[in-house]
Amino acid sequence: PAAISERIEVRRLMAWFNEKFFEEASGPLVMERIYKRFMNEQDGGGAPATDVIRAAKNNVRYHLSYIGWLARTRNFLAGDRPTYADLAAAAHLSAIDYLGDVPWSEDDAAKAWYARVKSRPSFRPLLSEWLAGVPASRTYVDLDF
């Protein structure tokens, strides 16, 4: 974006998703549902902590609501055009969408925004990645979920 206020908004949203969303939602879900299965017990591996998963899933709802509000008030999360903020949010969402942990039915605006972002050619290589032994959710590769 050209205007300083628009650049600030992009950076604010990038920090929101890369720090807050990661700490409260995507980080714990990926750690508990994926990383732990490949880690030694002495390194923190083992059975997933269901209380952590439950809390992170609740936090996803809160963040999804915020994404929906942004998507209803703007074309993209930080303004009229896609920015790094959209990519940051979509990257975190794609990780938990892979696991099937995004309640898309709870916010149509967030769902429509994510469908637009993941339909972009630059995002498609991300959707082609698969993890052996962990099948992707139905919505992960479906562009019109």
Task: Enumerate the language-model features and the residues they cover.
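Short coil/turn segments at secondary-structure boundaries
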Residues: 2, 26-30, 128-130
